Regions:
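Generic structural signal for buried aliphatic residues
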Residues: 8-15, 62, 151, 179
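Active-site region of chymotrypsin-like
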Residues: 1, 26-87, 116, 124, ...
Length: 209
């Protein structure tokens, strides 16, 4: 059975069950349920944070104490939470998976309009958004964005957090939409227009005959 994340509470027990049966299961604790933004243009409105971490977290099923599946293991994290350094896992809540599950099983991806992808890996440091690297031949690199650029705004909309920045890009439309970006480069304010793309077009795919 799947259980919605609105029934998940911090400090609840969580059981990571990976391949290998009980010998590879781990009793863990839910630290919090919160938003997550990843530098690779990725945002979860809700993510399940657990600790201690499971060493084989990828694709592991996370059960609660009632035996319901509440999430799927996705990441290993090393972060500072409430002033303390902490290792743990991030799991995708099952209720976020359910609407796309049939498409994923049949096609490997949701059959919804692709979000605009700009190929820019961004980190949030000291309240600033900094370009840490670029996808080779990706839209941002082709537009002239450089590693170390500071993102100031999308059009006239100031960016505040990594999640806010990505959502602002996605709110412009689907893949192919132009993304007006203002950056700070060594004290100079510069404006660029990035022609976004569908990330899937840049992925290696199986060859068919």
């Amino acid at each position: 059975d799947l259980e919605k994340s609105n029934l998940i509470n911090p400090s609840d027990d969580a059981y990571f069950v990976s391949y290998g049966g009980l010998d590879h299961a781990l009793h863990s604790k839910i630290i919090r349920v919160d938003e997550f933004a990843g530098y690779w243009e990725y945002v979860l409105d809700q993510a399940i944070y657990t600790s201690p971490p499971h060493p084989q977290w990828g694709g592991a099923a996370i059960f609660n104490g009632r035996g319901h599946v509440i999430g799927i293991g996705s990441l290993f994290l090393h972060e500072v939470f409430e002033g303390q350094s902490q290792q743990g896992n991030l799991a995708i809540p099952t209720h976020l998976l359910e609407p796309a599950l049939n498409d994923l099983l049949e096609f490997g991806r949701p059959l919804t309009p692709a979000r605009p992808w700009i190929g820019m890996y961004t980190t949030e440091t000291g309240g600033e958004l900094i370009v840490s690297s670029l996808a080779r031949y990706g839209p941002a690199e082709l537009a002239g964005i450089l590693q170390g650029d500071q993102i100031m705004s999308i059009g006239e909309e100031k960016t505040s957090t990594l999640a806010h920045f990505f959502r602002s890009v996605w709110n412009l439309g689907s893949a192919g939409v132009s993304v007006p970006l203002q950056i700070n480069r060594e004290g100079n304010e510069l404006k660029f227009v990035i022609n976004s793309a569908d990330r899937n077009d840049f992925l290696l795919k199986p060859k068919t005959h």
